[in-house]
UniProtKB/Swiss-Prot annotation:
<dbReference type="InterPro" id="IPR001357">
    <property type="entry name" value="BRCT_dom"/>
</dbReference>
<dbReference type="InterPro" id="IPR010994">
    <property type="entry name" value="RuvA_2-like"/>
</dbReference>
<keyword id="KW-0520">NAD</keyword>
<keyword id="KW-0235">DNA replication</keyword>
<feature type="binding site">
    <location>
        <position position="309"/>
    </location>
    <ligand>
        <name>NAD(+)</name>
    </ligand>
</feature>
<dbReference type="GO" id="GO:0003677">
    <property type="term" value="F:DNA binding"/>
</dbReference>
<keyword id="KW-0862">Zinc</keyword>
<feature type="binding site">
    <location>
        <position position="110"/>
    </location>
    <ligand>
        <name>NAD(+)</name>
    </ligand>
</feature>
<keyword id="KW-0227">DNA damage</keyword>
<dbReference type="Pfam" id="PF14520">
    <property type="entry name" value="HHH_5"/>
</dbReference>
<feature type="binding site">
    <location>
        <position position="403"/>
    </location>
    <ligand>
        <name>Zn(2+)</name>
    </ligand>
</feature>
<feature type="binding site">
    <location>
        <position position="421"/>
    </location>
    <ligand>
        <name>Zn(2+)</name>
    </ligand>
</feature>
<dbReference type="GO" id="GO:0046872">
    <property type="term" value="F:metal ion binding"/>
</dbReference>
<dbReference type="InterPro" id="IPR004149">
    <property type="entry name" value="Znf_DNAligase_C4"/>
</dbReference>
<dbReference type="Pfam" id="PF03119">
    <property type="entry name" value="DNA_ligase_ZBD"/>
</dbReference>
<feature type="binding site">
    <location>
        <position position="285"/>
    </location>
    <ligand>
        <name>NAD(+)</name>
    </ligand>
</feature>
<protein>
    <recommendedName>
        <fullName>DNA ligase</fullName>
        <ecNumber>6.5.1.2</ecNumber>
    </recommendedName>
</protein>
Amino acid sequence: MTVKEKIEQLRLQLHQHNYNYYVLNAPEISDKEFDDLMRELQDLEQEHPEYKDENSPTMRVGSDINKNFTQVAHKYPMLSLSNTYSENEVTDFYDRVRKALNEDFEICCEMKYDGTSISLTYENGKLIRAVTRGDGEKGDDVTDNVKTIRSIPLVLHGDNYPEVFEIRGEILMPWEVFEALNREKEAREEPLFANPRNAASGTLKLQNSAIVASRKLDAYLYYLLGDNLPTDGHYENLQEAAKWGFKISPLMRKCQTLQEVFDFINYWDVERKNLNVATDGIVLKVNSLKQQRNLGFTAKSPRWAIAYKFQAERALTRLNMVTYQVGRTGAVTPVANLDPVQLSGTVVKRASLHNADIIEGLDLHIGDMVYVEKGGEIIPKITGVDTSVRFMIGEKVKFITHCPECGSKLIRYEGEAAHYCPNETACPPQIKGKIEHFISRKAMNIDGLGPETVDMFYRLGLIHDTADLYQLTTDDIRGLDRMGDKSAENIIKGIMQSKEVPFERVIFALGIRFVGETVAKKIAKSFKDIEELENADLETLINIDEIGEKIARSILNYFANESNRKLVDRLKTAGLQLYRPEEDLSGHTDKLAGQSIVISGVFTHHSRDEYKDLIEKHGGKNVGSISSKTSFILAGDNMGPAKLEKASKLGIKIMNEEEFLKLIS
């Protein structure tokens, strides 16, 4: 046997033993025998570097090389799931799917593991890339760190896997490992991790993969993407993936009825406490991939899946005082300051009270014993008061009437729960909040700038709005507190680089009320530049897919404000991308210009989302509901009877897939 053949043999043996131990939980050799094989392979690879392989089992030990992570675009967006704590909303989801498909379907029920999401790409049976969720469109390349996780295969078993595919899952830290890690940190008098999810996420982002390897992370894989997948069934594909070497949850179950779904939920609401990893709910997915494609996606999440989250834990503690925070939109949020209490693995000292109505409804008094819950929110919330122990309490909590920062009288818009400070041009937290939003990662992504730096620049009078950032020079900021030459240069470089940020993110960065990332993308697709957007009327805005009257009026109000128009003009002068680039417009036609189109039914040739893109590409507008202004309906199979009746009553043309594709060809 040649040296090369011996190395290959050892690699195959170690991959198999690794799989037996970490995935099947059925080791065939002792730890010492495994270590001996590993040492033999390490020695041979060291003596023969010409046979180096990035997917060798020796790569799992990690390295102490320090590096920054590069960002990688996801081939398929990593959207989050819509979630609920309500069984009624699970029923609503099931009914929506049944109505939309109008045919038999199965629901795959899975544990919702509480870790950090990962996307793994394999080519020719080898792991080539591991990327975090990031912002859903791009994430950090953490391949070297993921290679240290022994339950993730570097090389696949068998040969019936697709040539290229992606598999997604959750990186986890088992409870036992988490508790041991926190004991070590406590002994070193270091801050403890709040929960296993934070520990897993923090570990995955460490620069030293040798430390990552020592943390004993685990992984469950839960979704397969790509061409030429084994079957049309999600559940069936994962069973195949298990044969290739992936760790797939054995707790998955296919359900034929809603009652079976609830039986699964109710069983695991109790039994999950006996699992060795953290879980916080159940994920429900339509099993057929074809049916998934037909159901499509909303802007933020798939229509074919939902996460049911188990009810949050709650704790009882004392309310000491209520303080108030002013956000970038001027919204004033009351915050309860509490005696520290342990809740869901974290120490809670503050909780949101949301608005004046909540305070009034709870009949809060200073000194009350209050119930605190922590569900999906980052900040816990107060859900009740234990009035049975109410004695020696202080005064009743009353919502403030004036801004705690600038003293302006607060206002409350009709139909809204929040109170607002109207002084948007001179209230410090609003100004700083707008700038912090502008520079944030999902907006202009300006490296080197953070809340503390923004606060310092504002206090020193260097910036008063976002456009002032583009007037800064290294001389302006060099020598400021903790600001050396290199830091100053990096900040100015980051500001200059932000001029290349695309139109949709600049729109988001403006901070227009109710205009989030998704709406900003819709706007950027609908207008060729900021001037078109500034001059758009209410009807034009409402006709944009997923933009209702509330968002449309907010956009109109923003541009009706002269100071906002001047700010946008200054940003334009600074060189920001306030227009769609020519390459975005290439391939676009005006074949559907001026037409408002409703999509309904289940399609064969393309998904609903693909048809929406085609409509926009050819100058049309996607609208969600039928009206007298609808140009035509693009109808697939099983179009809803209510829409059919309304279209008939209004005399609106119904077009099938073939007719539509011919129209735009």
